[in-house]
Amino acid sequence: MGNKSKAYKAAAEKIDKGRLYTPLKAAELVKETSSKNCDATVDVAIRLGVDPRKADQLVRGTVSLPNGTGKSVRVAVFAEGEKATEAQAAGADIVGTTELIEQITAGTIEFDVAIATPDQMAKVGRVARVLGPRGLMPNPKTGTVTNDVAKAIAEVKGGKISFRVDKASNLHAIIGKASFDAEKLAENYGALLDEINRIKPSSAKGIYVKKVTLTSTFGPGVPVDPSIQKNYTQA
């Protein structure tokens, strides 16, 4: 633990907390200060000027990151018959409905994304209390309730992520791995921020993107200038 603390402290000293970095410089610092023991995941935390208690200010959506997440995504698909066959052919990791629901209820299965065909949603509703709090409930708004299961699987495995503002007006998302080039991390961040800006609620007042922090697993946070909303790969 002591070594970790020393390593973290040394990494944190490289970051000027009183400065707001460009997305590219922040990505470079995240890479430089990430753990050397693993290929750390790079996350972004964004504070939005919205009131998520108001339905029209609940910011949520999806975006396909141009460079993917670098993460192997385990996909479960609720489907039967022909659609189940399509899902298996498209590379789904788990396919089924009744047995899958039983495994979810028993807590014996893990996956990162759930997709369902519309005709299976009544059954999926039985495990909504388990999937909902974990952000795994299929939803038409995120493209995870669909008859085109092959397309949905390809998008998710290719780097499509979902995001949603929480009760404290914060939004968290994975934008890659520490092994990515800094430019690729900045491009992924830019794609996410562009989509967040595109779906800005019309009722949101004042500054919309208030605070941005990039961080790697076990690494210190790097403050990003939230006013930079284009030319993300410029130093």
UniProtKB/Swiss-Prot annotation:
Pfam family, one: Ribosomal_L1
InterPro entries listed in its UniProt record: Ribosom_uL1_bac-type (IPR005878), Ribosomal_uL1 (IPR002143), Ribosomal_uL1-like (IPR023674), Ribosomal_uL1/biogenesis (IPR028364), Ribosomal_uL1_3-a/b-sand (IPR016095), Ribosomal_uL1_CS (IPR023673)
Record has Secreted as a keyword: no
Keyword Magnesium: no
UniProt keyword terms in alphabetical order: Repressor, Ribonucleoprotein, Ribosomal protein, RNA-binding, rRNA-binding, Translation regulation, tRNA-binding
GO biological process: regulation of translation; translation
UniProt xrefs under Gene3D superfamilies: 3.30.190.20, 3.40.50.790
Cellular component GO terms, alphabetical: large ribosomal subunit
GO MF annotations in UniProt: rRNA binding; structural constituent of ribosome; tRNA binding
Function (record text): Binds directly to 23S rRNA. The L1 stalk is quite mobile in the ribosome, and is involved in E site tRNA release. Protein L1 is also a translational repressor protein, it controls the translation of the L11 operon by binding to its mRNA.
Quaternary structure annotation from Swiss-Prot or TrEMBL: Part of the 50S ribosomal subunit.
Family stated for the protein in its record: Belongs to the universal ribosomal protein uL1 family.
Name this polypeptide is given: Large ribosomal subunit protein uL1
